[in-house]
Amino acid sequence: MKTYNSTATRENEPHWSALQEVQLSYRNKIKATQRPKINMAEDALALFRSVWNEDEMELVESFKMLLMNNANRVLGVYHGSTGGTAGTIVDIRILLTVALKSNACKIIVAHNHPSGNLTPSPADLKITERLKEAAKLMDITLLDHLIITTNSYQSFANEGLI
């Protein structure tokens, strides 16, 4: 019989009774009809700006995700990462874990460019495509990816990049 672990033996098998069952829960104290609704990129931009630390906008790159239900009502905003002056780490598994845990049907992601350059980098385009495809497997729609600077923004959806 093939084992998953080449060092596995019968004496180090787990005691199944000691394992815990995984349980999901999600609590939101705001009624769905009272949550903000995102209709266009400008709505998402306003919400992202309201939670972004403006003092860091030109200092370090950060990545955030807006979580929405099927009616585009906001479930929450997740701060994915903060990096350096020229990049940040985006972990798709963690983003999708957060989206699934919050029962999001749609997501919009955003990151800032401290340089003020609104042009997406090849890495920006690649991570957007990978996130879009991974989310699709979970029946989650990536609606947009915004690049934000202190004075402006670019929407991948408005530019036909999603």
Language-model features, listed with the residues they occupy:
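Active-site-proximal loop/helix of nucleotide/amide-processing enzymes and allied scaffolds
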Residues: 2-28, 46, 71, 81, ...
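Glycine-rich, small/polar surface segments that engage phosphate groups of diverse ligands
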Residues: 34-94, 98
